[in-house]
C-alpha cells in the first residue's frame, strides 16, 4: 500500500492510504489518454494500457489483507514491506500480467527488474535504491528469474508474426518508459497531499519509439496542474484516485 505523507505530520493523525491497485487505476487513466499530435499513442494500445493499469497487481492479496507495520500501526508502506513479501510481489505482478498477454508479462517484468536497477537509468524517480545485505541473494534470485522470463517471452513474441514488432528492443523500451512516466506521475499525486506538491519534471517520456522528452508539471492551485509539453488527448484531462483515511491502530 501507499501511505500519503500526512499534511500535518502528526504521528497519531489519520493517514490517507491507497491500495496498489488504486494507484494502478490512476496509472491506467494516464495511459488510456496518452497521445496527441506531439506524442504517439501506445502501441500495441490495448496491451500497453492493460499492463500499465495492472503493473502492481502482484499486490492484490496484500491489498485485501494487509500486514501492519508495528512502527506506524498502519499497513506497511510499500517500501517498508518486509523484503521477502516485496520480492514476492515483484514476481507476482509479471505472473498476473503474463496471463493477460505475453507482452503484458514482458513489460511488467521489465518494470520489476527496473525498480531494483535504477529504472534502467531512465528516471531519477527511484524508489527501491537500497536493499540490506542480508537480502541480496534473495533479491538477486528474483531478478535473475525475471531476466529468464523476459527471454522466454521475447522468444514467444518473436515466433508470432503479429507480435514480433512489439518485442523489438526500441518498441519495448518505449513502452517501458511510458509505464515509468505513468507510474511516477501517479505517485506524484499519491505520495503527497494537495497543497504540498511542488513543480518537478519527468525524464525520458517517449514522444515516439525513437524520441524522448522531459515533461514538467506545475501546480496552479485549486487541484489544477499544467504539464509541458502536454502529452494527453484531452485538455484538460480530469482524473481522480481513490483511497481512505485510516487511524493508526491502538
Regions found by a protein language model. Give the residues of each.
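Long intrinsically disordered, low-complexity, acidic S/T/P-rich regions
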Residues: 1-4
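Divalent metal-dependent catalytic cores for phosphoryl transfer on phosphate-bearing substrates
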Residues: 6-18, 28-29, 47-162, 166-196, ...
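Extended, charged low-complexity segments
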Residues: 179-250
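Short, conserved alpha-helical segments within structured domains
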Residues: 23, 44-49
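Short pre-active-site segment immediately N-terminal to the catalytic Zn-binding motif
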Residues: 32-46
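An active-site-proximal "capping" alpha-helix that borders the catalytic cofactor pocket
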Residues: 21-35
Amino acid at each position: 500500500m501507499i501511505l500519503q505523507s500526512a499534511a500535518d505530520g502528526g504521528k497519531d493523525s489519520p493517514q490517507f492510504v491507497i491500495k496498489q491497485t488504486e494507484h494502478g487505476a490512476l496509472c491506467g487513466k494516464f495511459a488510456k489518454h496518452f497521445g496527441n499530435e506531439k506524442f504517439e499513442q501506445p502501441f500495441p494500445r490495448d496491451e500497453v494500457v492493460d499492463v500499465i493499469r495492472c503493473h502492481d497487481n502482484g499486490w492484490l492479496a496484500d491489498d485485501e489483507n494487509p500486514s501492519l507495520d508495528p512502527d506506524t500501526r498502519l499497513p506497511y508502506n510499500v517500501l517498508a514491506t518486509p523484503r521477502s513479501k516485496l520480492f514476492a510481489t515483484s514476481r507476482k505482478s509479471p505472473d498476473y500480467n503474463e496471463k493477460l498477454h505475453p507482452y503484458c508479462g514482458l513489460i511488467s517484468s521489465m518494470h520489476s527488474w527496473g525498480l531494483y536497477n535504477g529504472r534502467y537509468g531512465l528516471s531519477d524517480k527511484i524508489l527501491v535504491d537500497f536493499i540490506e545485505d542480508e537480502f541480496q541473494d534473495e533479491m538477486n534470485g528474483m531478478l535473475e528469474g525475471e531476466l529468464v522470463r523476459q527471454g522466454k517471452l521475447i522468444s514467444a513474441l518473436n515466433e508470432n508474426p503479429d507480435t514480433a514488432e512489439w518485442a523489438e528492443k526500441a518498441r519495448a523500451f518505449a513502452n517501458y518508459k511510458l509505464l515509468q512516466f505513468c507510474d511516477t506521475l501517479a505517485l506524484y499525486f499519491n505520495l503527497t497531499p494537495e497543497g504540498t506538491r511542488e513543480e518537478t519534471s519527468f525524464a525520458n517520456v517517449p514522444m515516439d519509439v525513437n524520441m524522448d522528452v522531459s515533461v514538467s508539471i506545475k501546480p496552479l492551485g485549486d487541484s489544477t496542474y499544467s504539464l509541458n509539453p502536454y502529452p494527453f488527448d484531452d485538455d484538460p484531462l480530469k482524473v481522480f484516485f481513490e483511497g481512505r483515511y485510516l487511524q493508526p491502530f491502538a
